[in-house]
Amino acid sequence: MEEFQGYLELEKSRQRDFLYPLIFREYIYAFSHDHFLNGSILLENSGYDKKSSLLMVKHLITRMYHQNHFFFFTNYYNKNPFWGYNNNLYSQMLSEGFAVIVEIPLSLRLVSSLEEEEIAKSYNLRSSHSIFPFLEDKFPHLNYVSDVLIPYPLHLEILVQILRSWVKDASSFHLLRFFFHEYCNLNSLSTSKKLISFFSKRNRRLVLLLYNSYVCEYESIFLFLRNQSSHIRLTSYKGLFERIYFYGKIEHLVKVFANYFSAILRVFKDPLIHYVRYQAKSILVSKDTPLLINKWKYYLVNLWQCHFYVWSQPERIYINQLSKRSLDFLGYISSVRLNPSVVWTQMLENSFLIDNATQKLDTLVPIITLLASLAKAKFCNVLGHPISKPTWIDSSDFDIIDRFLRISRNLSHYYRGSSKKKNLYRIQYILRLSCVKTLARKHKSTVRALFKRLNSELLEEFFTEQEQVLSLIFPRTSFTLRRVYRGKIWYLDIICMNDLANHE
């Protein structure tokens, strides 16, 4: 009954946009604990378990009720042997609670916006592969591209001010600001970049919240001016744009830009500018002349410097021709190349050949980057020669083969959209031979002897599994299956790429 009453209080707080009381509710920390337990640094504490977790939450709430000014920023718990060597335990718990609480108004606005627009929850749009069909459709008809790395604010107060437009509750806002500043002072973190790096190992949800709020603020202004309207027509962003005083801020900003950058505003009417972003990297693509995209470059620099107080050098944003330079984006090396074709035409008694060259987007596997990742994970040396994985020899043969198979399957799944599969086959060969060497080292046998015994099984596991899956979708004809297996396939279930060494 008490838990049910707590959820009722949570609903009331949501309706009133008053989040401050939630910081004193135990179920908030229970939500965050369940989410972060598997990947939390709390697991490094030998004295930490579920029972002590509940005791620590109660202790944290009690101390906050007594207004001891965030005792977790002091050396109080350093003297208590119960906490072991994890000196940031309380601040870790509170940061996880903050992340859950601040997400509440954001998620509610997104859900309400989706309901108003009657948008179906399509999880396929979350896949990184969903971007490539758009690139294949647009890039062959465009000429110039500029890849832009979004700079990050140097001062923490900028991030706090951005969050202010999301959080109505002034108490929660000031509490969050105090937490950030005290945390930076305690750990000698002078910039927000250091804070993000520090938190990325402890609370990734809070890191993503800070970064996404900044990027959303930047893109909201960017797209607002791009569309030249008070109403954003892009439904995918609508849920993120309805914020307090948003349109008032934008109208004021438009007046400023109209007075000082009137020439730039005329650029927005051009419909041939395309914008794509993934994480911190964005791409601007245009047609005809580089003048248009060059104006956009200076517009972005002025936007960052005037609105976010972020220094960015225009000289470091390069504009290149798509036909002459490859683009490193989303783990692929993409470029536009001519695809020549010859058509035999016959008119009456005359027959002749017609050369027809079309532009096509090539997506290649970045072999150098993947070899460096494999070498870092100790699957091969820096030259790409397979080596054994000594840290795995204590596992069973089945677990060793299963680990290598999962990594090979993940890489094959992600890079099935490659135009050429030769580099992908090379990576799979390295993993297969590294697996054999690991087993040989475990059994103190030679690679040749072990490879003869396991060769057929490994070949079947590593190289025929993809064909077995495709055979369930397409007719079992060798010609059709061979064409499908060599062609491009973009999967819409890929949210992120797992780390090679920690793939589970």
Swiss-Prot record:
Protein name, per record: Maturase K
The lineage is:
Eukaryota, Viridiplantae, Streptophyta, Embryophyta, Tracheophyta
Key words, A-Z: Chloroplast, mRNA processing, Plastid, RNA-binding, tRNA processing
Instruction: Name the principal localization, coarsely classed.
Output: plastid
Q: What GO terms are given for molecular function?
A: RNA binding
Domain of life the protein comes from = Eukaryota
GO CC terms, sorted = chloroplast
Q: Which organism is it from?
A: Cucumis sativus (Cucumber)
Q: Name one Pfam family in it.
A: Intron_maturas2
UniProt keyword Plastid, yes or no: yes
InterPro entries, per this entry? Domain_X, Maturase_MatK, Maturase_MatK_N
The record's family statement is: Belongs to the intron maturase 2 family. MatK subfamily.
PANTHER family attached to this UniProt entry: MATURASE K (PTHR34811:SF1)
Q: What does this protein do?
A: Usually encoded in the trnK tRNA gene intron. Probably assists in splicing its own and other chloroplast group II introns.
The subcellular localization recorded is: Plastid, Chloroplast
* Biological process per Gene Ontology, one example term: tRNA processing
